[in-house]
Amino acid sequence: MPAVYGDRMTTFEDSEKESEYGYIRKVSGPVVVADGMNGAAMYELVRVGHDNLIGEIIRLEGDSATIQVYEETGGLTVNDPVLRTHKPLSVELGPGILGNIFDGIQRPLKTIAKRSGDVYIPRGVSVPPLDKDTQWDFQPKKLGVGDLLTGGDLYAIVDENSLMQHHVVLPPDAMGKITYIAPAGNYTIQDTVLELEFQGVVKKFTMLQTWPVRTPRPVASKLAADTPLLTGQRVLDALFPSVLGGTCAILGAFGCGKTVISQALSKYSNSDAVVYVGCGERGNEMAEVLMDFPQLTMTLPDGREESVMKRTTLVANTSNMPVAAREASIYTGITIAEYFRDMGYNVSMMADSGSRWAEALREISGRLAEMPADSGYPAYLAARLASFYEAAGKVKCLGGPERNGSVTIVGAVSPPGGDFSDPVTSATLSIVQVFWGLDKKLAQRKHFPSVNWLISYSKYSGALESFYEKFDSEFIDIRTKAREVLQREDDLNEIVQLVGKDALAETDKITLDTAKLLREDYLAQNAFTAYDKFCPFYKSVWMMRNIIHFYNLANQAVERGAGSDGQKITYSLIKLRLGDLFYRLVSQKFEDPAEGEDALVAKFKKLNEDLTAAFRNLEDETR
C-alpha cells in the first residue's frame, strides 16, 4: 500500500519493507536530518529522496539521523523518503580499477558520460564502479581442491593490462578449504572463481570484493622504510628525499607549481601504481591530467614504452562537485591504494589539495552547528588529518606468499596567501616527515620546481643512509657540503647588498658562484624538455659531485696561492683560465639520460678528471 505524505506519494519496491524508510525533517545544504531511522548505524549508506541521492549517516540521536548527502540536494522537501541500505559506504575492488577515473564515491565518470550524454553527472545516477561484462584472463596459482587458504592469500593472477599484473587477493576476513577453484580462462568479475568451506559453511568468491572506505585494510605488521621514493626531481631526490611508505606535504601558495610537482611524481616516480585524488581541485587541472597521462609513456627495464595511465587511477572531485563527496574522495583513494599495497606493490597516493578537503570538513561542521575552533575549522581537524596520513607506511602484507607493500602519501596544501601558520598547514606539518615548501618569490623568478631549500626538510635522511652508502659512499658528505654552500650564500647576500661583491674575500666569491651553479643549474629543472623532465639518481649525484669538486679545488687553489707577496691565484683568474670547464659544469643538465647510464657517467668522470688536471696546471704555473 503506498504511503502518502502531503502531496507526495512514496512507492515501495517489492523487496523493500516500509519500516526501512525514514522521512526528511530538515534540509541544510548537503546536510539532511531524517526521522524514523530506528536501528540505523553510523556511517550507513542511505538513499535520500525520490531521486535516490547517495548519503551517509554521520550522527544519530534517538530515532533521527543526520545524513551528509554526496549529491546536490536542491529539490528535496520535508517528508521525502530516506531508504536504508544496511551497509556502509564501500568501494568495489577488482580488475578494471587501473586506467579508470572515478568521482569521490567511486562512480565511473566515463561510463556516466556515455550513458547520460551530458557533461554533468545526473542526480541519483547509479552505475556500478567496475564493468561487470568485461572478460578477464584468470590464471590461478598452483592450488587444488583440499588446499587451505587464509585471508590475504594471493590465489590467482589477472593481466589487467600490458604493464600491471592484478593479483587476486582473498578478502582479509575469509579462510577455509578449497572446494572449487576455476580453471584458467576468461571470466567476468561476477563469475564465481573460488569456493571455500569453513566449519561446514561454503562461501563463493568472485574476483570482485567490496571494502568500507572508512575502515583501514588489515596488515600483518608495519616495517621500517629504507628505500627512497625517487621522483626524478633533483631538488627532492638529493636534498629532501622521501621513502617508499613515507608521508610528504607540498606546501605553497597558488601558482607555485604544486600540481606540476605532484603530476611529475605520478609520471616519473619509482612507484608501481599511482592513485591521484583531485580533491576540490579546478576542473581544468583534472582535464589536463586526463589529456596528458594517456600520452605520457614510461620506459620499462626491458626497453618497452608503456602509457603512464596503465598504472594510474584517478579520483576526481572538482571544486564544482558537491562538498560532502570531496570529504569522501580521500577515503576512496586511500582504500584503492591499500588494495594494491596488499598485492605487494609500492603505491603512491597524491591528494591535491588538503586545504580544500579541510574546507569541506569546515562547511559540513558548520552545517552541523559544531563548535568551531581555529579559523572556523572543526576541533577534530588535526585528528582527521592524522588518521589519513597514518594509512601510509611500508607493511608486511597478510597471507602468502610473503610480500611487502607500501603506500606513500603526498598531500598538497595551499595555505591562503602563503601563510604557513594556517591551521591546516600547522596540523599537516606536525604529522608528515617530509616538507617541500614552495616559495612564491622563486616561482616569480621562474625557478621551478620552486622548492625553497632553506625552509624545506626531510626526516628520512637517517633511514636512507644505508641505501646511500651502497649507492655512493661519498654522496652524504657531498650533500652536506652543498647544503652548507646554499646556507652560506643566504648569509652573504646581506653583506653583498651593503658592500658589493668585489669587497668580499676570494673564498666568499667562490661560495657565491658555486651557490649560483647549484641554484640555477642543479636545483632548477625544466619539466618541458626531454633531457631534464626526469633526472635519474646517478645523474643527480654526479652533477652535484662535480659542482662540489670545483668548489673544493677552487678554495684549495686560492689558499695555496696566497703568499707574503699577495694573492697569486684569485677567483677572477680561475674563471678566466677555466672558463670552458665552468661552461661544462653549467651544461651538465643538458646530458640526456636516453644515452644510457654508462655513457653519461663516463662524461661526468671525464669532467671530474679535467677539473683536477686544470687546477693542478694553474697552481704549477703560478708557483
UniProtKB/Swiss-Prot annotation:
PROSITE patterns, per database record: ATPASE_ALPHA_BETA (PS00152)
Keyword vocabulary terms for this entry: ATP-binding, Hydrogen ion transport, Ion transport, Nucleotide-binding, Translocase, Transport
GO molecular function, one term: ATP binding
CDD domains: ATP-synt_V_A-type_alpha_C (cd18111), ATP-synt_V_A-type_alpha_N (cd18119), V_A-ATPase_A (cd01134)
Catalyzed chemical reaction(s): ATP + H2O + 4 H(+)(in) = ADP + phosphate + 5 H(+)(out)
Entry keyword annotation includes tRNA-binding: no
Swiss-Prot/TrEMBL GO biological process terms: ATP metabolic process
Enzyme class: translocase
InterPro entries per the UniProt record, alphabetical: ATP-synt_VA_C, ATP-synth_a_Xtn, ATP_synth_asu-like_sf, ATPase_a/bsu_AS, ATPase_F1/V1/A1_a/bsu_N, ATPase_F1/V1/A1_a/bsu_N_sf, ATPase_F1/V1/A1_a/bsu_nucl-bd, ATPase_F1/V1_b/a_C
Residues holding ATP: G252, A253, F254, G255, C256, G257, K258, T259
Any one Gene Ontology cellular component term annotated for this protein: plant-type vacuole
EC number: 7.1.2.2
Domain of life: Eukaryota
Pfam families to which the protein is assigned, alphabetical: ATP-synt_ab, ATP-synt_ab_N, ATP-synt_ab_Xtn, ATP-synt_VA_C
Subunit and interaction comment: V-ATPase is a heteromultimeric enzyme composed of a peripheral catalytic V1 complex (main components: subunits A, B, C, D, E, and F) attached to an integral membrane V0 proton pore complex (main component: the proteolipid protein).
Function text: Catalytic subunit of the peripheral V1 complex of vacuolar ATPase. V-ATPase vacuolar ATPase is responsible for acidifying a variety of intracellular compartments in eukaryotic cells.
Family stated for the protein in its record: Belongs to the ATPase alpha/beta chains family.
NCBIfam families: PRK04192.1, V-ATPase_V1_A
Name this polypeptide is given: V-type proton ATPase catalytic subunit A
